[in-house]
């Protein structure tokens, strides 16, 4: 296993004006970025970064800084597959030449981090790429953008960083992988951490959710405790249906049966047959009830895989015209799946979960939660409820999104499909 350094060392190095290496999830970009605080930028540091990276230097910024400086999105509808929020490129208006030299880019970086700078201090376009970090940092989005801003803030500096991906010195044209990054870090006396480490550190030292209320909810599957939560970063309320003791005198928070269910008004409430959401929710509640211990976490704000109810209905229109559930999202300018599991992970931790058996057919959900320090010991499949209205939707989820859905081909061959229909999101 590759040796890593402590988050405390990385924060101290950032505060001292040094660079660090941050590695993300192997199921995400699986790359290591060189990161330092933007306000500490020097020509020497920028030159070092250019020499050992792709050279596409970016400056992650807190959202408030982007707003103050009028840094608009590079494109109106973000189509980056990881949701990286690129803004219009900039150069410092004064004190630079063409803007491309190490000295010029260091000047622009420091100016972006300067709390007294204003929009008119920059020209557009330029040679430095600001990135807008998501509010809540790595707890909301486990990316290098958020890691850079979090590290700067944790170091007591302005929430602005500088990042770029480290390239391989052994395999020209490729990005450096973990073992090579460790060698590089040791050669240059750089701390190396993972985003997962940073998430775990913040989870232990910070809290971004609030437990509001708890009440008894009798259901046809038996009685649950409904525990309501809010998040300081979004105006959305979530509810956890809890059965049994999760953590306490007689339970240690391990081996908990958990379903993280995304809100679906059409399927959960109206009983739409275009998706399998309602049957999945019902099955999850039944399985937790039979177990006698577990959680069904109902995540609001996840309608349509995160695009919202109105856009979901627009996607239905496209599906009725022949698009599948993935292409409909893409045609509307959204990613195939825009859901964020960070708040859900914090709620599970607050409920005392340490390790869990996750009720899902979606491997990406496992990755989304695993990156937040929760240990998933098993993925437990949910029964697939195929019908003539959702079979194409289910097959698209299987074929394009990697969902583990068995038996669909046999069902598909046994039914007459009523034209080009689509599924829920």
UniProtKB/Swiss-Prot annotation:
GTP cyclohydrolase II: region residues: 205-425
Cofactor or coenzyme needed: Mg(2+); Mn(2+); Zn(2+)
Region called DHBP synthase, residue ranges: 1-204
Cofactor note: Binds 2 divalent metal cations per subunit. Magnesium or manganese.
Site residues by UniProt (Essential for DHBP synthase activity): 127, 165
Enzyme Commission number, as recorded: 4.1.99.12, 3.5.4.25
Active site: residue positions: 337 (proton acceptor), 339 (nucleophile)
InterPro entries: DHBP_synth_RibB-like_a/b_dom, DHBP_synthase_RibB, GTP_cyclohydro_II, RibA, RibA-like_sf, Riboflavin_synth_RibBA
Entry GO CC: cytosol
Residues binding GTP: 259-263, 280, 303-305, 325, 360, 365
Record family assignment: In the N-terminal section; belongs to the DHBP synthase family.
Function of the protein: Catalyzes the conversion of D-ribulose 5-phosphate to formate and 3,4-dihydroxy-2-butanone 4-phosphate. Catalyzes the conversion of GTP to 2,5-diamino-6-ribosylamino-4(3H)-pyrimidinone 5'-phosphate (DARP), formate and pyrophosphate.
Protein name per the record: Riboflavin biosynthesis protein RibBA
Source organism per UniProt: Mycobacterium avium (strain 104)
